[in-house]
A protein has these predicted regions:
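Bacterial Sec-dependent N-terminal signal peptides
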Residues: 1-26
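N-terminal amphipathic/hydrophobic interface segments
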Residues: 21-143
Length: 143
C-alpha cells in the first residue's frame, strides 16, 4: 500500500510539473501544463494508461500554448499526448475565442480539438451553436 501511495504522489507531482508532447514555434517538444487537478485517480481498467483528474470544488484546468481549458473531469493520456475533458467544459484561446461544451478531446501533438454536446463557439461578434465541432489551432479553423 505504501508503494502505491508513493507512486500516486509521484504521478500527481509529475503531472503538475511537466507537459504533454507538442511542438512550439521553435520546433522543440513542449508539454501541456496541468494547472489544477483537484482529486486524481488511476483506473487502468476503464482508462488504460491515463490519469483522471476530478474537480474538488475548483475546476480542473490545463493549459497549452495560449489555450486554457476548464472542466469537471479530465482524463490525461501522457503517452498519446491527449486530454479528454468532460462536464461543463470551457476552452479559452487568448481573449477572443471561447468554446463551451460537455466534452472536448484535445490532442497536443496536432493542436486539434473535437467538442461535442451543446457546443457554443464565440469569436468576437460571431456565435456558432452545434452538437459537434472540430477545431484546428494550427489553421485557426473550426468546422
Amino acid at each position: 500500500m505504501k508503494h502505491r501511495d508513493t507512486y500516486i504522489l509521484f504521478l500527481f507531482l509529475f503531472n503538475f510539473c511537466t507537459y504533454l508532447w507538442s511542438q512550439d514555434s521553435n520546433g522543440k517538444t513542449r508539454r501541456i501544463e496541468i494547472v489544477y487537478g483537484g482529486e486524481f485517480t488511476i483506473d487502468n481498467v476503464k482508462y488504460p494508461g491515463a490519469t483522471i483528474f476530478k474537480s474538488d470544488g475548483q475546476r480542473v484546468q490545463f493549459r497549452h500554448q495560449g489555450l486554457d481549458v476548464w472542466c469537471d473531469l479530465a482524463v490525461l493520456y501522457e503517452e498519446r499526448n491527449e486530454v479528454i475533458a468532460h462536464g461543463k467544459v470551457v476552452l479559452q484561446q487568448g481573449d477572443t475565442l471561447q468554446m463551451n461544451s460537455q466534452y472536448i478531446s484535445y490532442k497536443g501533438n496536432t493542436k486539434t480539438a473535437v467538442a461535442r454536446e451543446g457546443v457554443v463557439l464565440r469569436n468576437g461578434n460571431m456565435t456558432l451553436e452545434t452538437e459537434e465541432l472540430f477545431f484546428d489551432r494550427n489553421k485557426q479553423e473550426a468546422y
